[in-house]
Amino acid sequence: MKTEFSLAQLADPDIAEADKILRACVHCGFCTATCPTYVLLGDELDSPRGRIYLIKEMLEKDQTPTAEVVKHVDRCLSCLACMTTCPSGVNYMHLVDQARVRIEQRYERPLAEWLLRRVLAFVLPDPQRFRASMVLARLARPLAVFLPTPRPS
């Protein structure tokens, strides 16, 4: 993939690494067949190839991540299925990791999303907190009928 980073941008080791990864991608699309989010949603931007385009544009323009970029990068499950099928050996996961770091540094998430992410980061790594949250969830389950059903957009 052709990139258009400036020399000043390439002085940053992270951008230089991203440039190397981006140049390895030949747009063959083999990754799309193994990507669970693409298979489920059918949106090109939810495939590794689509995310690579979004990340490339974000990095080249050195812009704050948009809600669309964040949505599609967040949908990546980090399952690495795309990397196992890529004939060019694109280190997709490293590129997505860089994008996620940039998103966390520059993107201001809505309060509800920010709070949910903080709670999950607090609860999931600790088995005792996770067990306690499951007990609370079981007790709160009857209240679920009053909540709207989320749908992917």
Predicted regions and their residues:
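Flexible inter-domain linker/hinge segments
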Residues: 1-2, 151
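N-terminal cofactor/phosphate-binding cores enriched in small/glycine residues
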Residues: 29-57
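Short Cys/His-rich zinc-binding micro-motifs
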Residues: 25
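Iron-sulfur-cluster electron-transfer modules
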Residues: 13-22, 46, 52-153
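A detector for short, charged/polar N-terminal pre-domain segments
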Residues: 2-15
